[in-house]
Amino acid sequence: MGNSIAGRVAVITGAAHGIGREICLELARRGATVWACDILGPELQETAAVVDAVVSGAHCKTRRVDVTRPGDVNSFINEVQQAEGRIDILVNNAGGVVGQTLQPLEGVSDDDWRVIFAINLDGAFHFTRAVTPMLKQQGRGSIVNISSGAGRSFSLTGIQAYASSKAGLIGFTRQTARELGEFGIRVNCVAPGFVRSNPDTERQWDAMGEEAQKRLIEGIALRRLGKPEDIAKAVAFFASDDALWITGQTISVDGGQWMLG
């Protein structure tokens, strides 16, 4: 297998920490020019510093972007296009629970519901829509969406909007893969298991308590939690030419937690 990512231009959303940061590192290690964005400006600068320190000769550029604002997204994509002349890889990683914790369904407000959908699903739509004209013109491209095991089953933390929006992202993956395939554009999805990678997941882990933590790990075939690099390597596979005849697929990277056909 050759390094088919070298020299390509990759846009990664939600890149300020955790899985997003590790995806930036993995693609940079493989020779991609990385454009990383997030709404968290200082943490995003830390990502750039880490990539530059770890990867010799890395090209990691950062911009503060709110994925829920189409104007911000379009401006960012236009900037990348003008600077690089192309975009080869889009990773829609931005998402999360925005600090929310479990509430009974009747206690979930409209705003609670909408804000999670706006980040987890609308953000991926905004970015995919923005890059599509360029990818069509190029006649190729790879889009990788980051869903969750919650999108294939249910949320361990019980947050209804999170599970629903991540399931929607899997459907969005299939639909766009079908539509864009004739233009040489592949769209795939990674569904991570539980990864302690950012402040939200640390809060969720702590809130479980010792017994629930033990049950969670015992329910994973490989008997460990995931690491950000586990997810990043799956993303790199989908982004590479090793996956040239794969589209519309969702792979669970969860240590065997959900054994789905």
Regions found by a protein language model. Give the residues of each.
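Canonical Rossmann dinucleotide-binding motif of NAD(H)/NADP(H)-dependent dehydrogenases/reductases
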Residues: 3-35
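Short C-terminal tail/terminal secondary-structure segment
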Residues: 4, 97, 101-102, 236, ...
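Substrate-binding pocket helix/loop in short-chain dehydrogenase/reductase
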Residues: 101-105, 109-117, 216
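Active-site helix of classical SDR
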Residues: 128, 165, 173
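Alpha-helical segment proximal to the catalytic Tyr-Lys
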Residues: 133, 152, 178-179, 244
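Short, small/polar-rich loop/turn modules that mediate ligand/substrate recognition or access, typified
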Residues: 181, 186, 246-248
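A glycine/serine/threonine-rich, flexible loop-to-helix segment
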Residues: 182, 194-220, 260-261
